[in-house]
Amino acid sequence: AMINYTFEPNEHTQFNLATSFRFGKNGYSALTWYDGADPRPDYYRYMPSYKLLNATDLEAASMAAASLADQWMRNVGNIRHFDWDEMYQTNMNFRNAEDEAIYGPGARSNYIIEERHTDQLDWNLAAQISRIYKDNSRLTAGANVRINRTWYYDEVKDLLGGDYYVDVDKFAQRDFGDPIMAQNDMDYYNQYGHARAVREGDKFSYNYKAHLRSSGVWATYATRFGGFGMKLGAELGGLSMWREGLWRKGLFPDNSKGRDRKSTRLNSS
């Protein structure tokens, strides 16, 4: 939404004021997985060239690579596409006593559709005043303010046949093998002793806000002397930014939650 206002107290002076406010949800979906085979058909381990990597029997590997390349060319068994049926079956049938002891009865999804959000609130205000003098010189001055908050988080969009998904950092778990470092929400883990089970519509993986504040003032003066013109201008502004973490992450337990130190910059010209 935008509002503009113009006021002319006399024929030599004009005042303009404009403000705008923008908000909404913005996200895009993607496939993600945990504790399951990579479902991407073009994953490098599924490519014909991978058959030749570190092969001890080059002749046999070459034949296997050629056969796989032929399947790709002819799209045998829809090899070039995601196998959604396989993912649904895996999710619906993934049950074990350890999970049920923690989360209760239900099938744990290995594959889900996530929606990565960048939801914004953005407010802008700009004011300008212009004055024309008797010698036709003009003085124009203005000020502007902007306040922006962008909320970054991941959301479960579709469990693909399962009942819940376990919210852990699969890359931290793979690289460090430490259940503490793999937690996306340490406060929850410390309270309950296990990672959260998330369902459709729940936030998971990451959750933080980025804040921005900016303001500035400026002025210009223009005049003419015979056939010559002169214009002078000056501007002064400031910008501050900071991150606000909403969860304490296992990889960075001491500085991931709460407000970071502000980064501030002054500009002048």
Could you say what each language-model-derived stretch is?
Residues 110-112, 116, 138-265, 269:
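Signature of Gram-negative outer-membrane beta-barrel scaffolds
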Residues 1-148:
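Outer-membrane beta-barrel domain signature, strongest for Gram-negative TonB-dependent receptors
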